Structure formats: C-alpha cells, structure tokens
Amino acid sequence: MLENPLIQQVLFEIMDEDVVGFDVLSVLINTNEVTDDEISRQLDVKLNNIRRILYKLYEARLVDYNREKDEETNWYTYTWKPSLEKVPALVAKKMKNVLNGLKEQLEMEETNMFFFCSDCEIKFTFEDAMDSGFRCPQCGGMMYEYDNKKDISLLKEQINYLEDEFTKNPLFSAY
C-alpha cells in the first residue's frame, strides 16, 4: 500500500514533508508495536523528531498509542502501533479535494482570456490586465496575450489521471 504514489504524497504532506516519516512507518509496520525511544535508536534519529512525526501521524489517525507509567521513575512510556486501515479513506478525501480544485482551475482556464508579463512571469486575467492598462503592476512592463492551451491540456491530463486512479485502483473502490 505504501508503494502507491498517491498514498506516498498524502503521507508526505501529513508528515510535513519529512522523509524520515516513511522510515518511522516502516518500523511501525515491521514491528507492529514499538516505543518512540526504540524507533529513535533504530533509525538513529533524535527522539524529538520521531515524536513530532508520530504526533502528526496520530493527528491523522494513522497510528495509535498506549501510555504506561513507570512506577519507579514516574515517567510515561508510549508504545505506538500502526493504524493504516484509514489510509485509503484519507487519500480518497484528499484526492477528491485535489480533483475539485483541478476542475475549478480548468473551468477558470477555459472561460477566461489571460495576459502574461514575460519579465515577471505572472499571468493575469483579462479583467486584471485591463484594469492595469495591460502593464504589469509589478514591473510596469507590457503584458501580452497568453495562450493557455498547454495549461488546459495539462489540467485535463491531471484530472484524467486522478479519475482513473480513483476508479481503477482497488484501494479506493469503497470510496
């Protein structure tokens, strides 16, 4: 399941783009139940970093923990375990949001005329370009009509890819 690029992307975002998170998940999956301290030692990563990743995963409900108090030291030990059955639903929700955003962007691209400042590389709608007299508000340079056919084509490809993935991938069949 973790080999799926869509799942990897969503997990990467959940873990604040920290690739160590995948190592943490691997340890959790392979051991099924482990303390944060054991993960830290096994991966040779600072305990604070491991805990930060685990808390992010917990917020997404992708891991659970048990807390036990050591009666001698009065310290708590947290034992973590994976709870990855929620991953497909989480990814499906994220995919739907991305898909909706892409469809909105496609509609915007298809229903508007755009202008472009080649110096600043900023794209403007016709209305915004007209309001500024077809001069870039950043640099004052002249704006030129922008051909967005490639943008439209790319958006359609991305939408088709996500829709295909959503309908054909067995991970998402229930969603």
From Swiss-Prot:
Transcription factor that plays a role in the activation of archaeal genes transcribed by RNA polymerase. Facilitates transcription initiation by enhancing TATA-box recognition by TATA-box-binding protein (Tbp), and transcription factor B (Tfb) and RNA polymerase recruitment. Not absolutely required for transcription in vitro, but particularly important in cases where Tbp or Tfb function is not optimal. It dynamically alters the nucleic acid-binding properties of RNA polymerases by stabilizing the initiation complex and destabilizing elongation complexes. SMART domains: TFIIE (SM00531). This is Transcription factor E. One of its GO terms (biological process) is transcription initiation at RNA polymerase II promoter. Belongs to the TFE family. InterPro entries: TF_E_archaea (IPR016481), TFE (IPR039997), TFIIE/TFIIEa_HTH (IPR017919), TFIIE_asu (IPR002853), TFIIEa/SarR/Rpc3_HTH_dom (IPR024550), WH-like_DNA-bd_sf (IPR036388), WH_DNA-bd_sf (IPR036390). It comes from Methanococcus maripaludis (strain C5 / ATCC BAA-1333). Gene3D superfamilies: Winged helix-like DNA-binding domain superfamily/Winged helix DNA-binding domain. GO terms for molecular function: DNA binding. The keyword Transferase does not apply. Monomer. Interaction with RNA polymerase subunits RpoF and RpoE is necessary for Tfe stimulatory transcription activity. Able to interact with Tbp and RNA polymerase in the absence of DNA promoter. Interacts both with the preinitiation and elongation complexes. It comes from the Archaea. Keywords: DNA-binding, Transcription, Transcription regulation. The winged helix domain is involved in binding to DNA in the preinitiation complex. Residues 3-88 form the HTH TFE/IIEalpha-type domain.
